């Protein structure tokens, strides 16, 4: 049974000669009667700029302004915007507020492909959609559908994409200004930083607002994340078209940019100018690497598994092997991550950190000891030859625990499966 029911009336014209207003209202009453016992959200989509048409036909706004719709005010929410992208995104926000995922869309047959194209852009696989033909409810052709819309060409799909992107660009930033944390260790010929959660448009509470990763298991669609990346690129000064994320596997594979890209990897290295590489983080450590001598850089995603597998030194070693870097020239900066105050592991997993160094584990005798993945990363880097003074793991916001600071950072430990993602990024300036 649907948790939310959306009724698309924006593509219809009303035939005033046949008293179709009452027929439509009766049909809406019937839809409400059928779905109200289970659905938590019932909504009618209208077109704000509809107007009186020729030959006695009226747009839906004419009905909305009349007395007929007033009797439905307590039964349906009405969403009316000049463009369908705005209407559907507004509805998505309302659905997300209620944490709903099963959605029925009652839509005229000639608009079904159109609606599916918008839904495909604005929603993820978290949501389950069912489409029902609205025309089956009409009697005696009292309502006349407008000219058919077929979303079949590349140009039409591009137009939808453009409409959605244009609308998202118009939205205000949430939770304050976009903030980027940087390290004084990284020289100016590199562009780098670590993001916080402010300054984006993501509205789901655990993803708000500068979420920078989309997946089938979360509620932020790719187009919203792309808008967040665009805003970050404008603020930081990099080219969003040359933006590469790690394809996380919680392991130690490193992609050398310019060579064949692996299916998954937790490190990237490059010496290409103007290319921005990024490591994801939401408790795991986003790490950036820079060699100002050989003009090369890298990033790594280091969770507890990747830490033990040596992903940080694997990234360093790739820079040495590919670009002739000297280990003593490489600068390493650890971005915000979960602290030992909040991160625990089963004892059988914590044993490996204790073996690395006892100071990496607190309450070792408990069933779930507290583990310091940042300290473990520093130890492994120093053992690999990175100079202690070339490692930055403590500075203002860089060493804040992501789980302890919900106003600044996303956290899987704190927020569960629908968590947001911040990043560490670096590029060699052009």
Swiss-Prot record:
Modification comment: Phosphorylated on tyrosine residues.
Chief location bin: cytoplasm
Keyword DNA-binding on entry: no
Description of the deletion phenotype: No visible phenotype in normal conditions. Mice show increased inflammatory response in mouse models of arthritis and inflammation.
A cellular component annotation (GO) from this entry: endoplasmic reticulum
Summary of the tissues where the protein is detected: Predominantly expressed in myeloid cells. Highly expressed in primary macrophages and dendritic cells sorted from the peritoneum or spleen, respectively (at protein level).
Protein keywords: Acetylation, Cytoplasm, Endoplasmic reticulum, Hydrolase, Immunity, Inflammatory response, Innate immunity, Metal-binding, Nucleus, Peroxisome, Phosphoprotein, Transferase, Zinc
InterPro entries per the UniProt record, alphabetical: Cu_polyphenol_OxRdtase, Cu_polyphenol_OxRdtase_sf, Cytotoxic_necrot_fac-like_cat
Subcellular location: Cytoplasm; Nucleus; Endoplasmic reticulum; Peroxisome
Reactions performed catalytically: adenosine + phosphate = alpha-D-ribose 1-phosphate + adenine; inosine + phosphate = alpha-D-ribose 1-phosphate + hypoxanthine; guanosine + phosphate = alpha-D-ribose 1-phosphate + guanine; S-methyl-5'-thioadenosine + phosphate = 5-(methylsulfanyl)-alpha-D-ribose 1-phosphate + adenine
UniProt keyword annotation of Aminoacyl-tRNA synthetase present: no
GO molecular function: adenosine deaminase activity; guanosine phosphorylase activity; metal ion binding; purine-nucleoside phosphorylase activity; S-methyl-5-thioadenosine phosphorylase activity
Modified residues (N6-acetyllysine): 247
Pfam families: Cu-oxidase_4
UniProt: Zn(2+) binding residues: 250, 284, 301
Family stated for the protein in its record: Belongs to the purine nucleoside phosphorylase YfiH/LACC1 family.
Protein's job: Purine nucleoside enzyme that catalyzes the phosphorolysis of adenosine, guanosine and inosine nucleosides, yielding D-ribose 1-phosphate and the respective free bases, adenine, guanine and hypoxanthine. Also catalyzes the phosphorolysis of S-methyl-5'-thioadenosine into adenine and S-methyl-5-thio-alpha-D-ribose 1-phosphate. Also has adenosine deaminase activity. Acts as a regulator of innate immunity in macrophages by modulating the purine nucleotide metabolism, thereby regulating the metabolic function and bioenergetic state of macrophages.
Oligomer status and interactors: Interacts with FASN. Interacts with SDHA. Interacts with ATF6, EIF2AK3 and ERN1.
Protein known as: Purine nucleoside phosphorylase LACC1
Organism: Mus musculus (Mouse)
Gene: Lacc1
